[in-house]
């Protein structure tokens, strides 16, 4: 955190003018906070995330206090998780659990259908559809447009060709959007333009990213797809969006951060996170360090394989956050 310089003013009027400018600056910052992801400088390795008005926030606790190890099985755990990279060089060999069908996510809180689907039996991981449903509800609340249609998710078990156009659909973490105009019966393409630009501009708030942006085709190896969205989770989607990183770039970006020197980040909802990378050991397992709180409880965290060479850990460092559910971890060491 930069040192705060202190100045003495001989002229009281000058001091009041400076104070007024500061107040106006803070007011402007607060008014735009909810709509803008907070940027992190990708060039400053192991540095703290840039925070709006950081002087008023408590410092994120360091991770070098009490901690424990979670034992990850490299053969299975490294190829599963919300942040797995699936592309032409890294195929999906993991498993998909906790799935759901799309139908119940097409309605608002009053039970009115506000979105449509190409099939009520479309299937994906539950967290993917939960993010889609929340985003769709907020889009409808803001734009009063009910033409969004989810067109593709996981391929059917007996359809060998349904995922050939995109590497990611097998993971249960991706879906494609289309449009359906019930008044005309037309099915326009989802281009993400006009009112629909709201989707790509706000999807990060729900843990979603536009997976194949127009300016990243040389990195992803896939032509731009304005309709294809991928669930990566919170706060990863916000970090990626703020720094204009596609998933390939984010996988490399996180490798600059370790358990000893993590990326610390305050999300748009003021939740404090620490994110770091753990390289997979050469053996069959990897001991992944995760921090404990002051009561020696495991802090809420997620551990995702990257499907390349290791694990990405995200820890909720906010005070009074609910402890992690240790029963979900298969093998732990104190």
Predicted segment positions?
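Bacterial N-terminal signal peptides
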Residues: 17-25
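Extracytoplasmic cell-surface/polysaccharide-interacting catalytic and binding patches
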Residues: 31-42, 46-334
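N-terminal Sec-pathway targeting helices
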Residues: 3-17
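C-terminal motif of bacterial Sec signal peptides marking the signal peptidase cleavage site
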Residues: 27-29
């Amino acid at each position: 955190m930069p040192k705060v310089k202190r100045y003495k003013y001989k002229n009281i009027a000058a001091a009041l003018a400076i104070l007024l400018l500061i107040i106006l600056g803070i007011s402007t910052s607060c008014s735009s906070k909810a709509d803008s992801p907070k940027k992190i400088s990708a060039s400053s390795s192991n540095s703290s995330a840039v925070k709006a008005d950081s002087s008023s926030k408590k410092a994120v606790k360091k991770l070098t206090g009490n901690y424990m190890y979670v034992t990850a099985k490299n053969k299975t755990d490294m190829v599963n998780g919300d942040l797995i990279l699936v592309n032409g060089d890294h195929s999906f060999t993991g498993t998909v659990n906790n799935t759901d069908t799309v139908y119940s996510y097409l309605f608002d809180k009053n039970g009115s259908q506000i979105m449509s689907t190409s099939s009520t039996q479309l299937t994906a991981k539950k967290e993917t559809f939960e993010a889609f449903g929340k985003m769709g509800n907020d889009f409808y609340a803001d734009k009063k447009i009910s033409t969004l249609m989810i067109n593709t998710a996981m391929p059917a078990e007996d359809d060998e060709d349904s995922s050939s156009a995109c590497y990611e659909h097998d993971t249960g973490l991706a879906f494609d959007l289309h449009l359906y105009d019930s008044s005309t019966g037309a099915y326009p393409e989802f281009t993400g333009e006009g009112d629909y630009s709201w989707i790509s501009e706000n999807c990060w708030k729900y843990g979603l990213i536009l997976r194949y942006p127009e300016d990243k085709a040389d990195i992803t190896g896939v032509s731009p797809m304005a309709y294809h969205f991928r669930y990566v989770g919170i706060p990863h989607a916000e970090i990626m969006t703020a720094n204009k990183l596609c998933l390939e770039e984010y996988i490399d970006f996180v490798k600059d951060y370790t358990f000893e020197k993590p990326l610390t980040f305050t999300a748009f909802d003021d939740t404090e996170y620490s994110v770091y990378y753990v390289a997979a050991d050469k053996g069959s397992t990897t001991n992944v360090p995760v921090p404990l709180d002051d009561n020696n409880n495991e802090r809420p965290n997620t551990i995702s394989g990257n499907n390349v060479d290791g694990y990405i850990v995200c820890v909720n460092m906010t005070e009074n956050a609910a402890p992690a559910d240790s029963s979900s971890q298969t093998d732990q060491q104190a």
